[in-house]
Amino acid sequence: MSAFAALKNNPFGESIFNNTSNGDNHSRDDVEEDEVVQYIANSSDEDDDDDNDDNDNDQGNEDNNLFPLEISAPVDTSISSTPAPILNSRITQSNYTPNESNLKFSDNHVTITLNPSEYIIISGQCNLKIIKGSIKINQCHCLTSEDNKSYNIIALQSQSLPIISHYTTPEMEEDGVTSVSIIQLENSFSGIENISQIEPAFKNLISGQPNVEEPSLFKNYSFDIVLTETNGGYGLDINSYWINELNLLKSNKDDPTPKIIMIIGNKNTGKSTFCKSLINELLLTNPNRPVSYLEIDPGQSEYSTPCALSLSEIVQAQFGLAALPHKNNNIVKSRVEHYFGFTSAVNAPTRYVEIIEELFNHHQTKFSQRNHLIINTPGWVKGYGKELLNQITKIINPDKLILLSNNLNQEYPDNANILQDLTYQSLSIIPGVYQLSKYSAPQIRTINKLLYFHQTTTTGTFNFNDHLLDSSPLKISYACGNSPNNPGIYSTTIINHNIDNEFSHRDLCSLVEVSIYGIYSIKSNGNTKFDEMSCFRRDDGNSPFYLNPDDFDNLLSNETITSKFIGLIMVHSINPNDHYMNIYAPDIIINRLRKVLSTNSNQTNDYKLIMIRGEGDIPNCEMLYPEFINKKIDYLKSIKKRKAATTSRKLVDLKLPYISFETKSKVGGIWKVRKNIKRRGHHQKG
């Protein structure tokens, strides 16, 4: 039986939502069938997570820096057979029927009355406020009107949607009192609703596939109530196993000793969902005690900058998508980040472990006496990923290790293999929530990059009405042999690329262009002078200084050096004659860069800006500027129709880099093999 077929059953937990149809027959709009994120039995967790480079390679390679000798690969790479996972109950629509008495419309908000056993699924963006009574979110988080708080919800189709249900408190049950719950949903247009103007594939990211036959009642609002099944959307129904574990973890709210809780498991088991649920429960139970959140999954992070690892101090519950820093100042009090550069630890494992150790040490120094620490790990728990997990648990030694699995027996072969050699104080095994995402992992990472580069600090929103190329890039100078004192970028580094004397530095400009870079600000606190360091390569007069990745790591680990990760920039192009780069970045990052440069102009040139790159891929939708593409297509059409000379409109042939407009030949092109078909002459005559 296939893994997908086995996903139709659910033995885990009871729910008030179980009477609803599972809704298994979902098509995937705008997503090819082979892009769907799904669990495949007996497969490596890294094989299908990324496009090309995230493979579960267990063989050592002495000449490859991807597997440094500091971390040894496992000897035994055998993988036990794994049964197909089981699907958690799927809630695809609300059981709430709107009428004149339970639904009131206003210009900027709607008021909804929920009776006992009623629930709604929310899609889109809104501010939630409880007017009367109590509600439960995702059958787990209890909110009451006495809190007098407003909660911002960003519910995208790339994630499970929040479920809001009526709730009767234990005190009311004892008194035999039944009461309605009244909530208010207020508009909250953040700009994400316009993301399809940049990438049409995300046109249903906010509200799902529209129903042509039954137009939505909420078409003029920033949110929607899912009253009928949408194409691929489902609500988050937390099962009883999770609820029991969450209640156990929050029961010691008065314990002054903070706990370190690490969540592990295969990918697509619900690790991020459990982490956010646990954080919300801890904050709702004790609002005055912040929670530290260590994200070490660079491929599926929410609070972190894309391709970065972070430690966040969270002070308020958040339902749905975790907003970006400028939007959640009241949610995240502080954040420390380090640029990793890739979406998988396989590309730079030693650097990965070193960053985790640095972030954990920061928590131990700043927050260990007060905050609980929740750690979200990647889903790579086999082969070399298992070896990395061993290293991480030795560094952290969590008080509680929670394994999300499809079998609750600790002696089950897969569980035993994962837990072998791990370091922890206590263990819980709970069922994973195996849900298929509507969007593939690469698409979700593209969404995160678009959200990052289109954020606007001044308005606290996202600008998806304009492409980045609609505005001129920012010019920033760089230091080189002919201009060593330029105040801008001092050097550049590409992870896993140590260059030697045979490398032609004239090619460095081409290597740097059209990529996303992390940028650090570094300062020497001692007598060390960067201009005197021999580790910076200054071989070419017009190319940027280059710092090998090993030297970069040594520089940041130097006790006399102070470093800070500023954020991401997108390098558009380089002018080697005038020694400057054209870059794009969010305005919050540009302001940080200007602050560093202004500090250098007022004092000596103490601060240096160093760029570092990992995979560095720019989303295609940012490079394929529609206006240029359309002009090129019009020109090619005019040439094809032989009207270029007679057309009244003069067309210009744009020379666009990185884009091919060559059409496939119908003759001699791709062969399509046809099997078991015989031509008339092939039939034997009796």
Curated annotation (Swiss-Prot):
Span list, region Disordered: 1-67
Signal sequence, start to end: none
Keywords, in A-Z order: ATP-binding, Kinase, Nucleotide-binding, Nucleus, rRNA processing, Transferase
GO terms for cellular component: nucleolus; nucleus
Coiled coil: none
Main location: nucleus
Homology family: Belongs to the Clp1 family. NOL9/GRC3 subfamily.
UniProt name for this protein: Polynucleotide 5'-hydroxyl-kinase GRC3
Gene coding for it: GRC3
